[in-house]
Amino acid sequence: MSRIFLQGLLVFTVCLVLSSAGRTTEITEFRVVSPGEVEITFTSDAGVLYDVLGSEDLRNFSVLTRVSGSGDRTRVAVQVPVGQTERRFFRIRTPQLPPTPEWFRSYGGSGEESHGHYILACEDGGVLQVGETGFLPNTRILAIKLDQEGRLEWRQEYSNRTTGASGHGTYNLGNSVLEVDEAYWIAGAINRNSAAIKVNKGTGEAELVKTHSNGGYDAYEHMVETDGGLVAVGYTNAEDRENTFFAEGRGYLAFLDPEGNKTGGRSLRDDLAQAYRIAKHEQALIVSGLVWNEDDNLDFGLLKLNADGSRVWGRLFGGARDDHCFGMDLGADGSIFLTGHTLSGTINWQTYTMKLDHDGILQWERKRGNPRGFDPRFIHDEAWGVRATPDGGCILTAGTGDEYGSYSETIGSHVSDQWEVYVIKYGPEGGLEWEATYEAEEGDWAGEDLALTRDGGVIIAVDSSQFGFLKLPSF
């Protein structure tokens, strides 16, 4: 009893000292329910959102859950790792919305410009971004790893030379990265062929480089780890080789062993022109991407496959004009979130986001854009990445700006010609919780991807003509 009482007293003190960042609240009761669960009661207001944060060292707090106040006292059960209840600290706060950036870092490669496509929040607390440096066709894959404070840990480039060839080759593409126990796997292309590159976690040095000629100009876009190795998706027979986002090819899926050797594959061309993302849910594979419809416009495409790649079902989403699907993530309950941008039912390109259940049945869809209030005829809002959030909603990133020489407008400190990072947070039922834009002191920014960090915040991959890293705190 004395140990539990002391822990409850310590939690109470921590709350009083550290809750000043949001609306102050007080933990009034604390109880260990079981070795892996605690119960916290705190002062609250009905209907107000509160974040319950936990820490092992009083330095780094992460969001454990978000609850709505039920009156002047709210009680919540919180899961904690078994064996850590004696050395676990808690605090309660109201969310700070929209969040103010903690830091921004920018790093480049050997090329004049560098463009990131994917960002990963790593198990060690750091972040890893991949993309290319240079301009097509003479690009090299670039990977940059930072620690949790934004300090550079390593930077590596990969090309045809990484395979042992004498030249760098062309059309080297870094499309995404996957973390496994002992390494990172980069999915992309080397010298016009699909590539899987296994790199050392500590240095980024390539340990294995596997290239597969799957047909014409081809590439892997994304990978997922399975019991038998890896499954990669991408495209073959690209018609637009100068486009790193949609190459107008044929969707493709490949099975790789743990060493990256291809053991099988199948075309997805009947369902997807380009397979862009893959995720695993139980024993099934969920694949998203872009598909041509009967009117020769693009729609969101979604597939559920068995573990052997056989088709379970396919879904199409979109309207009368182009709908470009680039981001996908799965919630803890198997819910599927898709994002991209659309011209269907909009004045110009706007973000297009939807939530589906695990059977691919639409739960809600939202179109949103022009957050700075310019003439919508000239504004592009282009979304590239989405992440499911613990509350059952999602957060996405985009770029917002205009590309028209005939139009330029200034509203306050915002200029339409200057692109900015655009972030949108939706709740479980699709309600807008907050949105924000983030701008450079000079030049353009655009959000390319994002990941949820271990402290409950977000890291955003920013196109700033280099690899930009924008860190937002817990939201």
Task: Report the location of each language-model feature.
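Short, composition-biased motifs enriched in small/polar/acidic residues
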Residues: 20-98
